[in-house]
Amino acid sequence: MKRTLKVSFFILCLLPLFLGSKAEQCGSQAGGAVCPNGLCCSKFGFCGSTDPYCGDGCQSQCKSSPTPTIPTPSTGGGDVGRLVPSSLFDQMLKYRNDGRCAGHGFYTYDAFIAAARSFNGFGTTGDDNTKKKELAAFLAQTSHETTGGWPTAPDGPYAWGYCFVSEQNTQEVYCSPKDWPCAPGKKYYGRGPIQLTHNYNYGLAGQAIKEDLINNPDLLSTNPTVSFKTAIWFWMTPQANKPSSHDVITGRWTPSAADSSAGRVPGYGVITNIINGGIECGHGQDNRVDDRVGFYKRYCQIFGVDPGGNLDCNNQRSFA
């Protein structure tokens, strides 16, 4: 059993935003360009929605202008438990507590429900079919990130989601201290359902859920509610020129002209592009994409909803 992908691959696509290894995106450094999706333009010419971008020196679309709202925990999300009772959760993630899974016993139903109810709109947007599709999509993408399945696994490879808590290579530090610090001796490798990676993602997620994840990154592998919260935060939050996965699956995202020309059309495939498009998308068939689709189809079948079209990103250019 081996987890096939980790979010660190996706983060490679975001490194230009944080490390400055790519040409500036906006402002005087980019010929007066304005950031997409209402993002702030920092004094250094990069797009974002947090204080380093919208605060001192911000060049355009600053705090007085509309910017994307980064979700913070609230008391919303009333009926996720109605749509996903514990019996259904156990059916979907059938082997998560199997002794052959390194993370057995960690991902509890109660932790998922508590985290889900902390974010307004998650699993509660639209009609019941839309809500179920979002929950199926979230559980499918995170199941792929934590999969312990193999082709001949009991009940098939798509019954083995949520098998791992931490990535298998725990030697990498993943510290890029330009915008967020790194605590001495701490590592920011992939942890949790979305395999959150890099200190700046730990910092942003911790800021949103009010936990000090810079100094306590291991909370993602010791506290299942915190772990689920970081995954849902990632799901609900737009990234630079990328929409949130939540907006895509609930039909709230409208592709721009650039998206359309890149083949990025509404559907589950765009979510894979958001998460790991620089690695998996745009070069034809990819086994990792197929695995994500396989989980999604299984979960949609369990929910009794149509998965819809545009499930892969084989012919989509990445957002990067």
Curated annotation (Swiss-Prot):
Catalytic activity: Random endo-hydrolysis of N-acetyl-beta-D-glucosaminide (1->4)-beta-linkages in chitin and chitodextrins
Disulfide topology: C26-C41, C35-C47, C40-C54, C58-C62, C101-C163, C175-C182, C281-C313
Active site per UniProt: E145 (proton donor)
Cleavable signal peptide: 1-23
Induction statement: By fungal infection.
Lineage top rank: taxon: Eukaryota
EC number(s) per entry: 3.2.1.14
Span of domain Chitin-binding type-1: 24-64
Molecular function, one GO term: endochitinase activity
Matching CDD domains: chitinase_GH19 (cd00325), ChtBD1_GH19_hevein (cd06921)
InterPro entries from the UniProt entry: Chitin-bd_1, Chitin-binding_1_CS, Endochitinase-like_sf, Glyco_hydro_19, Glyco_hydro_19_cat, Lysozyme-like_dom_sf
Main enzyme class: hydrolase
Stored SMART domains: ChtBD1 (SM00270)
Keywords, comma-separated and alphabetical: Carbohydrate metabolism, Chitin degradation, Chitin-binding, Disulfide bond, Glycosidase, Hydrolase, Plant defense, Polysaccharide degradation, Signal
Function (record text): Defense against chitin-containing fungal pathogens.
Name of the protein this chain belongs to: Endochitinase
Organism of provenance: Pisum sativum (Garden pea)
Record lineage: Eukaryota, Viridiplantae, Streptophyta, Embryophyta, Tracheophyta
